[in-house]
Curated annotation (Swiss-Prot):
<dbReference type="GO" id="GO:0000028">
    <property type="term" value="P:ribosomal small subunit assembly"/>
</dbReference>
<keyword id="KW-0690">Ribosome biogenesis</keyword>
<dbReference type="InterPro" id="IPR028998">
    <property type="entry name" value="RimP_C"/>
</dbReference>
<comment type="function">
    <text>Required for maturation of 30S ribosomal subunits.</text>
</comment>
<dbReference type="GO" id="GO:0005829">
    <property type="term" value="C:cytosol"/>
</dbReference>
<dbReference type="InterPro" id="IPR036847">
    <property type="entry name" value="RimP_C_sf"/>
</dbReference>
<dbReference type="InterPro" id="IPR003728">
    <property type="entry name" value="Ribosome_maturation_RimP"/>
</dbReference>
<dbReference type="Pfam" id="PF02576">
    <property type="entry name" value="RimP_N"/>
</dbReference>
<dbReference type="Pfam" id="PF17384">
    <property type="entry name" value="DUF150_C"/>
</dbReference>
<protein>
    <recommendedName>
        <fullName>Ribosome maturation factor RimP</fullName>
    </recommendedName>
</protein>
<keyword id="KW-0963">Cytoplasm</keyword>
<dbReference type="InterPro" id="IPR035956">
    <property type="entry name" value="RimP_N_sf"/>
</dbReference>
<dbReference type="InterPro" id="IPR028989">
    <property type="entry name" value="RimP_N"/>
</dbReference>
<comment type="similarity">
    <text>Belongs to the RimP family.</text>
</comment>
<dbReference type="GO" id="GO:0006412">
    <property type="term" value="P:translation"/>
</dbReference>
Length: 154
């Protein structure tokens, strides 16, 4: 079974648990670091996720994973907040963070650059739209974008 298939199965398992608590399932990652595998589930809610929220979701998902056993080897389960600089992946993410400063990384350089920063204007017709330097609009086709994340200035 591939990583992507495992992530899809776990997403199907996690969604009802997360929704039951009125949280948002932000992402599921199944990755190998060193010799260990990690199943990371990122959740969020308006106002932010607490450690208690993570614990409740972790325990419920862990029970289901133990029963259904979809992953053929050992792994560590981690449930956490996606963090302030979370990647924006879903259309709802682009709507939620409209007006905020974002960083867009593309796979192939555009005019010699791979990283662009600007105000998130929106997402339309499978394109991410940002405003650079106050008023210059840039559009990025979703399949040409490696990563979009919020830029947090302190």
């Amino acid at each position: 079974m591939t990583r992507k298939e495992i992530e899809e199965i776990v997403t199907e398992i996690a969604n009802p648990v997360v929704n039951k608590h009125s949280f948002e399932l932000v992402d599921v990652e199944f990755i190998k670091e060193g010799s260990s595998w990690y199943l990371r589930i990122y959740i969020d809610k308006p106002g932010g996720i607490t450690i208690d929220d993570c614990q409740v979701v972790s325990e419920e998902i862990s029970d289901i994973l133990d029963k259904e056993d979809p992953i053929p080897h050992s792994y560590f389960l981690e449930v956490s907040s996606p963090g302030l600089d979370r990647p924006l992946k879903k259309e709802s993410d682009f709507e939620r963070f409209k007006g905020e400063l974002v960083e867009v990384k593309v796979f192939k350089p555009i005019e010699g650059k791979k990283i662009f920063e600007g105000e998130l204007v929106g997402y339309k017709d499978n394109k991410i739209i940002i405003k650079k330097n106050g008023n210059e609009l840039m559009e990025f086709e979703r399949d040409k974008v490696a990563l979009v994340r919020r830029v947090i200035k302190f």
